[in-house]
A protein has these predicted regions:
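Conserved short beta-strand elements that form part of the metal-binding/catalytic scaffold
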Residues: 28-63, 114-119
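Structural motif
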Residues: 5, 48-51, 65-67, 102
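Short beta-strand micro-motifs in enzyme catalytic cores
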Residues: 39-41, 66, 101-105
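N-terminal beta-strand motif that seeds the catalytic metal site of vicinal oxygen chelate
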Residues: 1-19, 66-68, 120-121
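Vicinal oxygen chelate
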Residues: 3, 10, 31-34, 79-80, ...
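Mid-chain, well-packed structural core segment of small domains
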Residues: 62-88
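Catalytic core of tubulin tyrosine ligase-like
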Residues: 22
Length: 121
């Protein structure tokens, strides 16, 4: 069976600001594709694209919609980068009470989307 999640899109107001935000926070390079009014910067995992920062006239960022969560090595360091790039912490690093499950946090990205983080430490 294929992975359960096929693809995700993170809406933007300022596409280039959002790309800079995610590249800096997660230390990745996101290939950019543009087609007329639509723009995408793609998150890749091994050889496949799993999601994108997406800009189109009818896409509106929100902290009230679906939450996409990213794995990271260190939540504290990642949240520091979020703050430096203009994001805000919505829920600080919090222990997941089920034994052995690690930690999570929530932040608002540069566009106002609510995003989650998960880490073992």
């Amino acid at each position: 069976m294929k992975k359960f999640i096929a693809f995700f899109e993170i809406p933007t107001v300022d596409f280039h600001r959002a790309v800079d935000f995610y590249e800096t926070v997660f230390g990745v390079q996101l290939p950019v594709f543009e087609c007329e009014e639509e723009k995408m910067a793609c998150f890749t995992e091994e050889v496949e694209t799993v999601g994108a920062i997406f800009h189109a006239p009818d896409y509106i960022p929100s902290e009230k919609g679906v939450v996409i969560s990213f794995n990271c090595e260190d939540i504290d360091q990642t949240l520091e980068k979020v703050l430096r790039k203009g994001g805000k912490i919505m829920m600080p690093k919090t222990k997941i009470e089920v034994e052995g499950r690690g930690w999570f946090a929530l932040f608002a990205d540069s566009e106002g989307n609510r995003v989650g983080l998960y880490a073992d430490k």
